[in-house]
């Protein structure tokens, strides 16, 4: 996170009025990933679909990151609880380090206009629960580097329900360091 981010950016729950802007951010993110060696993670299926984003908003699990001026520059899914992510129940090549209730971030994306948006969103989510899990595609080196920079540890591999595609699983916990 950059100095002054707290004054510059804030997180709030997404509203239906934000949908068009959220969709624009995902278009940018898919293009960014394709240009940075990760064309498969969201590109072929135009992930995430609009109906899933609408569902996330309706269920109160979609968030946006706004600048101090109210411009939406990032978005993500966040939920927390005990055993809340079914695909995280089975992990190969390793193990989760903390079995306590956790938060999950999915579908994190920014429009690229504000440096540090992804870090700000992840720091906010971690601050809500002190134990966060996230997964990413093996080709998503940008996200892998960000997670490592923020103190997340790679724990193994999980498989996404929709297509049984492998994802690198990361975790950060107040209870387990290093």
Region spans (language model):
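A short beta-loop-alpha structural element at the N-terminal edge
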Residues: 10-24
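Conserved GNAT-fold acetyl-CoA-binding loop/helix
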Residues: 31-51
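Conserved beta-strand in the GNAT
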Residues: 64, 71-81
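Conserved acyl-donor/pantetheine-binding loop and adjacent beta-alpha core of acyl/acetyltransferases
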Residues: 77-113
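Conserved GNAT acetyl-CoA-binding A-motif
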Residues: 104, 128-139
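Conserved acetyl-CoA-binding loop-helix of GNAT-fold acetyltransferases
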Residues: 113-127, 145-149
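Conserved catalytic-core motifs of GNAT/GCN5-like acyltransferases
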Residues: 135, 153-167
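Conserved active-site alpha-helix within GNAT-family acetyltransferase domains
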Residues: 139-156
């Amino acid at each position: 996170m950059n100095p002054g981010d707290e004054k510059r950016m804030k997180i709030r729950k997404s509203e239906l009025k934000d949908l068009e802007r959220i969709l624009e951010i995902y278009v940018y993110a898919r293009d960014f990933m394709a240009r940075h060696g990760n064309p498969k993670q969201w590109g072929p299926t135009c992930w995430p679909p609009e109906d899933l984003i609408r569902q996330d908003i309706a269920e109160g699990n979609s968030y946006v990151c706004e600048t101090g001026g109210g411009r939406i520059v990032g978005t993500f899914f966040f939920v927390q609880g005990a055993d809340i992510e079914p695909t995280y129940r089975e992990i190969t090549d390793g193990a989760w380090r903390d079995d306590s209730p956790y938060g999950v971030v999915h579908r994190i994306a920014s429009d690229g206009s504000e440096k540090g948006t992804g870090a700000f969103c992840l720091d906010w989510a971690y601050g809500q629960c002190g134990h966060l899990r996230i997964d990413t595609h093996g080709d998503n080196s940008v996200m892998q580097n960000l997670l490592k920079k923020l103190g997340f540890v790679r724990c193994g591999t999980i498989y996404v329900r929709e297509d049984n595609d492998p994802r690198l699983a990361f975790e950060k916990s107040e209870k387990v360091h290093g």
